[in-house]
């Protein structure tokens, strides 16, 4: 849902064109979320959802960051958010398509705020890290970013991804028991093997660039879930270590502890889990400002 009390076309042409990409086949809950004020352009944040999810995954964070004074953009990633929960659109998702979209989102955010933050979850976390490597944004917060699969060793992930691309695409259920009965309120109940492999190609490119150059973002906070079941925490720590060799003072790793075995810690469908993680994620994206204490001498 776009929140606005002015002409987006007049002030933010790129943003208006992005919103227009939400065609009739996109579900109401799958549409790009925009919460902006015409009178405030100090801070903007882009929130990037995970694979097969939709912008509604970040609805609560979008609301709270807007209340904190941010202009907020939660874009619908390419080929996501269709009204048909069994849409085959993801099988056509490509790595260059995702990267081009992120470039567009960052440029839009620069129209919305002088200081830009990008945060994202899972595949959105991967894209956030990719943006952190390339763009001089103020802050980047990759949340449980997809740099590999938890049960596949890093050295094997590349060959596995390329093998997936040499065979026909397959769709797999996120929940093999519920299958299509799994709630699709925030996205598709399936993922595509080709989409997964193309996302990993972005991760490989990111790691190659990170070994050679420091991240362009002024501050990066990588967020990992200590009880992660899907993405590879070792790979997250590896990127953290690589980046810190370049800029140890501006890269940090925040590990969430005390959660049950889990991956999706942001979706409103898992409201108890998301509720526990929410304050930590909010503070990672918008850190509390130090309080100045006045002393009477």
Regions flagged by a language model, labelled:
Residues 38-39, 186-259, 275-295:
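Serine-hydrolase catalytic core
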Residues 2-40:
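N-terminal cap/lid segment of alpha/beta-hydrolase-fold proteins
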Residues 119-128:
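Gly/Ala-rich beta-loop-alpha elbow adjacent to hydrolase catalytic centers
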Residues 83-112:
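Catalytic nucleophile-loop/oxyanion-hole region of alpha/beta-hydrolase
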Residues 141-152:
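Active-site nucleophile loop of the alpha/beta-hydrolase fold
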Residues 27-80:
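Short, surface-exposed "cap/lid" segments of acyl-processing enzymes
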Residues 76-83, 146, 259:
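Short beta-to-alpha linker loops that shape the active-site pocket of alpha/beta-hydrolase fold enzymes
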């Amino acid at each position: 849902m776009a929140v606005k009390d002015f002409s987006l076309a007049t002030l933010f042409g790129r943003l208006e064109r992005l919103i227009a990409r939400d065609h009739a086949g996109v579900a109401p809950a799958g549409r790009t979320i925009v919460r902006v004020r015409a009178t405030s352009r100090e801070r903007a944040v882009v929130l990037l959802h995970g694979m097969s999810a939709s912008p509604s995954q970040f609805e609560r964070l979008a609301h709270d960051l807007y209340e904190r004074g941010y202009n907020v953009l939660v874009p619908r990633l390419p080929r996501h958010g269709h009204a048909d929960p069994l849409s085959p659109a993801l099988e056509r998702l490509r790595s260059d398509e995702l990267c081009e979209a992120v470039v567009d989102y960052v440029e839009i955010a620069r129209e919305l705020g002088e200081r830009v933050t990008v945060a994202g979850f899972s595949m959105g976390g991967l894209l956030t890290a990719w943006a952190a490597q390339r763009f001089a944004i103020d802050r980047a917060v990759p949340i449980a970013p997809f740099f590999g699969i938890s049960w596949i060793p890093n050295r094997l992930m590349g060959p596995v991804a390329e093998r997936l691309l040499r065979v026909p695409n397959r769709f797999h259920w996120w929940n093999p028991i519920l299958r299509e009965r799994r709630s699709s309120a925030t996205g598709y109940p399936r993922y595509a093997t080709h989409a997964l492999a193309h996302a990993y190609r972005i991760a490989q490119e990111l790691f190659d660039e990170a070994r050679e150059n420091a991240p362009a973002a002024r501050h990066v906070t990588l967020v990992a879930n200590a009880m992660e079941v899907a993405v590879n925490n070792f790979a997250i720590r590896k990127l953290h270590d690589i980046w810190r060799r370049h800029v140890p003072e501006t890269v940090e790793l925040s590990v969430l502890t005390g959660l049950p075995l889990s991956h999706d810690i942001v979706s409103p469908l898992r409201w108890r889990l998301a509720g526990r993680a929410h304050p930590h994620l909010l503070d990672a994206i918008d850190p509390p400002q130090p309080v100045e204490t006045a002393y009477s001498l």
